[in-house]
Amino acid sequence: MPDNVALFATTILILPMFYLLLAAPAFLLVKLNVTPVARLLRGMFNSYFIVLTIAGVIGTAAVVMTGRWGLAIGFGLMTALAATSRRWFLERMNFDIEQEAIDADVAHRMRRLHWGGMLANAVQLAAVIACIPYISVAPA
């Protein structure tokens, strides 16, 4: 019989990941040397990491209440990864947003971070989805 709390917690964790999977590729079609576009990209990743951290805390709390400590540790690690990734990622994406135009080096660095963020999100999403059959039927 499936564990409804574990499936609920997993679904909460998957939603922000799925959002970024759909939203981030749109930035591949635009140049990142335009300041408003770069700000929007930075804001999207900032919001993603914040929402993923909040979703991870909610999921961890829900699983802890059911007494499934192994799963709670997994959710807690995913939450900690999101919180630390946000800081690391945004520190590298910072630039002078008051500039009229962004130079090519900064745009290239942002493009690499964009690809890296999309890849990391896809790997995490695939890992969480691959674990659903094991999460939903694991004993307490």
Please report, for each region that a protein language model flagged, where it lies by residue.
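Polytopic transmembrane helical bundles with strong interfacial aromatic enrichment
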Residues: 1-140
